[in-house]
């Protein structure tokens, strides 16, 4: 199998929340470019963890359609601005942040009071404008997660007055890939994979690709040493379980049960040593009891005893 190399061929930063890199992976065998590119793209967009504000409690506000005296934005606009705040956390545990600003002032993310384990990526993100001497005061919950979480209801019933926010956990904003045919030194037709990654600044594209590759490797690793049970092994195991079933579980009549016990027949395995004719010859058993046992074995376990008499070993 061809061993490929990866190289970062381009990297740019357009502000704190817009990082871009292009990677070249080569050489790959024909068809591997699409397989690897698609797997990496889906992993980068859905499986990398990020941090976001998930709920907000604003002083004097009971629902998202409220307005706040002296604040230019309504509550819904403020929630949308908080949704865009990019954070980076050193822990997976939920935490709480706060904000209290007295106007007149333009409120940005630099005014947020964050726990020591949470890092703010862009201190210039706009939140709201306060007119006059009014005060904007809020408390917000911060969590770590994956993907994009839509709110199920506007009010978080687990915490009084908290309004939920559609959380964007994805640190990777966009991924593109392109495959190209190339020729090796031996003139063999191979592939080149070009991978473009855009992130929100909470992670470098290089680190994102590295994490994505690690996730894929760990996901596929069990397939290297996979052991499938043969049908024969499954059949033997199933037969062994059935043989261990006691005759009590067949729910026989008292007469049939006592006769079997006196004949030292305690389990299904013991019954399988008998034919239908053998059962009839058990002392005090009779045709009716034999039919009861035969019917119970067939209906409950799918077992059919042979009709003809067996020869017992001495």
From Swiss-Prot:
CDD domains, A to Z: RNAP_alpha_NTD
GO molecular function, one term: DNA-directed RNA polymerase activity
Tree of life domain: Eukaryota
Cross-referenced InterPro entries: DNA-dir_RNA_pol_insert, DNA-dir_RNA_pol_RpoA/D/Rpb3, DNA-dir_RpoA, RBP11-like, RNAP_asu_C, RNApol_insert_sf
Gene3D superfamilies xrefs: 5' to 3' exonuclease, C-terminal subdomain, DNA-directed RNA polymerase, insert domain, RNA polymerase, RBP11-like subunit
SUPFAM superfamilies given in the database record: C-terminal domain of RNA polymerase alpha subunit, Insert subdomain of RNA polymerase alpha subunit, RBP11-like subunits of RNA polymerase
Annotated compartments: Plastid, Chloroplast
Reaction(s) catalysed by this chain's protein: RNA(n) + a ribonucleoside 5'-triphosphate = RNA(n+1) + diphosphate
Region (Alpha C-terminal domain (alpha-CTD)): 241-314
Subunit-level organization: In plastids the minimal PEP RNA polymerase catalytic core is composed of four subunits: alpha, beta, beta', and beta''. When a (nuclear-encoded) sigma factor is associated with the core the holoenzyme is formed, which can initiate transcription.
Domain comment in the entry: The N-terminal domain is essential for RNAP assembly and basal transcription, whereas the C-terminal domain is involved in interaction with transcriptional regulators and with upstream promoter elements.
Family, per entry: Belongs to the RNA polymerase alpha chain family.
Function: DNA-dependent RNA polymerase catalyzes the transcription of DNA into RNA using the four ribonucleoside triphosphates as substrates.
Name of this chain's protein: DNA-directed RNA polymerase subunit alpha
Species of the source: Rhodomonas salina (Cryptomonas salina)
Gene name of this polypeptide: rpoA
